[in-house]
Amino acid sequence: MGNPVEGVEYEDAHEEAERWVRGDRQADYYEQFLERSLENPLAAHGDGPLNKILKPEDMPWELSPQGLLKHMLNEDMAEELDYPGMGADMYQQVIPPGSHSGKHRHRGEEIVIVLEGEGYDHHWDAQLTVTGEQDREEPEWEFDDEPSKFEWEAGDAVYVPVNTIHQHHNTSEEDPARFISIQARAFTNLGFGYEDLEQFEAAPEYESDE
């Protein structure tokens, strides 16, 4: 079987719509997830909470050290809006033409889904050093001296490993780049996500706004 959406026309489509449909590879992951869920006695299969939609008006903007963010979901928002989405932290980020995000690291892994634009990431990967000292309260991490470069475009998904220092760059001088950042809430609840967040460099827009 070829591409299941081949032949579908996208009139006036955005760049992301033209790119994400590429590829013929298929899988049955969802059916496997469903089968395992039905066999799980602890899984809930009821109607669940009623408030399941967040509107753009519910999602606040923030000009942060990491850049311009539009928060889609986090623990504080879930409590304020009586929203059941407690499993993930998500925000959209917009990087102006020719600019870049701040540079930071957090203990939890992250997935970045590119919606618009093109650019690259710099990643300084982290290695956990085992010293044998049983009384050490915090693990010791060593970071690469030079970053690895990963180019991306609309439709791509970028994986940011645990504790990796990273920074996003928009290579277009005309168009903004926009992506969604997702991090599992479990890391945060265990103290391994945004509870362990370190900023090394601020986005230019944040610095100019100070």
Indicate residue ranges for each PLM-predicted region.
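A structural connector/turn signal
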Residues: 90, 100, 109, 147, ...
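Conserved short histidine dyad/triad with adjacent acidic residue
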Residues: 74-76, 89-106, 125-128, 162
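Double-stranded beta-helix
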Residues: 2-25, 129, 133-136, 142-143, ...
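A short, N-terminal "cap"/entry segment at the start of jelly-roll beta-barrel domains
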Residues: 1-86, 194-199, 206-210
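Short beta-strand His + acidic residue motifs that chelate non-heme Fe in jelly-roll/DSBH
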Residues: 101-104, 121-122, 149-151, 160, ...
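Short acidic-glycine-tyrosine-enriched beta hairpin
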Residues: 113, 126-162
